[in-house]
Amino acid sequence: MRAGLCLAGLIVSLLTISLLAAEKSIDVSAIVPKTEAEKILGEPVRNPTPLNVNSKDGYYSKCNYYGTKSGRSLLLRVRQAGEGSVDPLTEFDQIASSGGKMKVIEGVGDKAGMFTGAPENGLPPNVIMLYVVKGRSLITIGIGGIADEASALEKAKQVAEKILAQL
């Protein structure tokens, strides 16, 4: 009986630790530091002002990097949904149906899509926005100022994979 209770306690503890590890808050500015943003954008960037906050909707981490030589930019956002808040998959679907034309991106997270700088998407030229859902998290990566859309998407996917590895 005593051994059974100890075993049950151990299992509950391990499950709790696993659950907490899976829901740990992340800092996107630590995952993609300034030096890496400079490599992604191909030029020096200004010092960012990251923000990491808990709110009634969950945990939110954001960081923007802006190039010093051109209009290039890298925008990073992660929302880890809290209990009772909008589910990330629902939020993704709302974004996808917001009037633009979202391109489905395979092989990243549970679900991913991208808006480009096409007029129907309401974005300026040479801008992509990649949205990735993984579990209770919605990742948003914006890259601006890179004319080659395929290159910008590849860079955004690499950033997404780095963030996904920390969730």
Where are these regions (language model features)?
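Bacterial N-terminal signal peptides
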Residues: 6-17
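N-terminal secretory signal peptides that target proteins for export/translocation
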Residues: 1-4
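Short, solvent-exposed recognition patches
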Residues: 39-126
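A short, solvent-exposed beta-edge/loop patch
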Residues: 22-24, 29-30, 34, 38, ...
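Intrinsically disordered and other compositionally biased segments
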Residues: 15, 20-21, 53
